[in-house]
Structure formats: C-alpha cells, structure tokens
Amino acid sequence: MRSAQVYRWQIPMDAGVVLRDRRLKTRDGLYVCLREGEREGWGEISPLPGFSQETWEEAQSVLLAWVNNWLAGDCELPQMPSVAFGVSCALAELADTLPQAANYRTAPLCNGDPDDLILKLADMPGEKVAKVKVGLYEAVRDGMVVNLLLEAIPDLHLRLDANRAWTPLKGQQFAKYVNPDYRHRIAFLEEPCKTRDDSRAFARETGIAIAWDESLREPDFAFVAEEGVRAVVIKPTLTGSLEKVREQVQAAHALGLTAVISSSIESSLGLTQLARIAAWLTPDTIPGLDTLDLMQAQQVRRWPGSTLPVVEVDALERLL
C-alpha cells in the first residue's frame, strides 16, 4: 500500500547571503515523503533562485502531479531537475539503494577577515582544503587574499569559485598577485571567465587549473579531457535524477577528472543526503557542502555537529 506527503517550508537565511546580485532572505523548498508498506523515503526539492531554471512554485506543481501518478502506480521520473533529484532520492531511500554511509567532511567556505581565516584554517585537522569565492570584489584584492592564505599555510589547498565573473583582463589581474610557486595548491578555480574559451585560455596562460560547473548544464557541453581542466563540480539539485548525477560522475572519472558533489544551499535534510551521495559516488573527494551555516535552522534531519536549532516535521506545512 502506497502513501505520500508533500511538505512546504521556508528557512530564514543569514543577512549576508547574495546570489547573482540578489539577496536571499529565505530558502524556500519542498520535501516529499513516500511510504510503501513499512518503508519510507524522503527527498528535497529546492530550486535555487538565480541558478535553477524552475521556480519552487513550478516545482511544486510538477511534484504534486508526480506524487498522484506514483500513488496510481506510475514511477516515471519528472524531467524538471530539482523535482527529478528529490523524487529519485526518495525512491532510492524507499528501495534502500542510497547507502547510509556519509562523507561529512567539508571544505569550509572562507569569508571575512584574512587574519581570522588564517588562524581558523591553520587549526583544521587532517587534509586542509578550503573554498574561497572570488569575483565579488576587485580581482587584484582576490589575488592578494588567495596569495596571503597560501603563503601563511603551506599545506593548504584552495578551491576557488568565480561564477564566470571575470573578463580575461580581470583574470590576468588576479593571477598577477598569486605567486607562481603557490598556484599548484589551487586545486581548481571554477569557471573563471564569462565564456568557456576565455576560461580555457586563463588556465593555459596562468597554469591555474580550472573546473566546470555552470557549463555542465549547457546543451552543448561534452565531457572531454582538456589541458588545464582538472575537475567538474556537480550540483545535483541543478542536475536532475540520481542516475544522471551518477552518469556525470562516471564520465568525469573516466577522463581522470575530479568530480565534486556540491551544495545548492539545500536544507540539512538535503545536505545529509548529498553527504551520502558523495560517500557513495566520490568517496576519495571532499564534497562542497559547507552551506548550512548560511541558514538559521536545520530541518527534520540533523547535520552532525551543527548547533543550529532543528525544525521537526510536525511544524511543516502539509500539501496533501
């Protein structure tokens, strides 16, 4: 016997969260809970404003229609990426095919005063990998901050993300201030320039490895080995079903590329599932999941070690 529930939720964000020049005051999304006999599976559907093509209202409409079809015996996945991902997670939990083991290691997102960051990063246990957003300020400033961190902590490796912010000139201004001796400790720089060709040229000219992120979701993208390209950053909420995520990871690994499972600012429930997906598909790579502290609460499932308050399922709005 099948049953299901859909929950709508909204989490207040910290004041400083800006995405694509838009301040994100709340994170809005949906959960689907599927039950069959004694088994239960959950999934999160939370399109990311400015990045997802669909709104959460559109996702809600598609999700509710899919749930009704599922209750009637139809299991075909929807095409909308955020819904396909959430539904496929719920089905995988229901079928017990999403492993419980999770990779809760994170590459901490660095912002704020560089002196404070140096102290924090120097105390990190184990492999020191951190992430820095670049492209929000002047490229010269970004280069100086990155150089300072790499100089101060000799065993630190940085993942950088420019979100296609730079022209070729700005990319060169950034690189000018990063000591060539430190550049090999930049694990990768996600999408430095506005076009893929400019990003490729940046990698060739600077020796700084790049990663594809937004490019993966463009219709003309193909997985090929290229000089200077070291990684792909896969955001399942923006990608689609678990099967599509797995196909992308396998395509990357076949070319010797690092595949990084990364957050689209999901709630704690979604983040814990991403940690399980990372342990399953990319066990040797630290995922990019350090976004929970951008929110003011956890929901339904806790992230280990987080002190944020937890909103239980009974407090969420039911849609069925």
From Swiss-Prot:
EC number per UniProt: 4.2.1.113
Molecular function (Gene Ontology), one example: O-succinylbenzoate synthase activity
Entry-linked SUPFAM superfamilies: Enolase C-terminal domain-like (SSF51604), Enolase N-terminal domain-like (SSF54826)
SMART domains in the record: MR_MLE
UniProt record, GO biological process: menaquinone biosynthetic process
Active site: 133, 235
Keywords assigned by UniProt, alphabetized: Lyase, Magnesium, Menaquinone biosynthesis, Metal-binding
Pathway given in the UniProt record: Quinol/quinone metabolism; 1,4-dihydroxy-2-naphthoate biosynthesis; 1,4-dihydroxy-2-naphthoate from chorismate: step 4/7; Quinol/quinone metabolism; menaquinone biosynthesis
Swiss-Prot/TrEMBL cofactor(s): a divalent metal cation
Catalytic activity: (1R,6R)-6-hydroxy-2-succinyl-cyclohexa-2,4-diene-1-carboxylate = 2-succinylbenzoate + H2O
Entry-linked Pfam families: MenC_N (PF21508), MR_MLE_C (PF13378)
Binding annotation for Mg(2+): 161, 190, 213
Stored PANTHER family: O-SUCCINYLBENZOATE SYNTHASE, O-SUCCINYLBENZOATE SYNTHASE-RELATED
Record-linked HAMAP family: MenC_1 (MF_00470)
Function statement: Converts 2-succinyl-6-hydroxy-2,4-cyclohexadiene-1-carboxylate (SHCHC) to 2-succinylbenzoate (OSB).
Family: Belongs to the mandelate racemase/muconate lactonizing enzyme family. MenC type 1 subfamily.
This protein's name: o-succinylbenzoate synthase
Encoding gene (name): menC
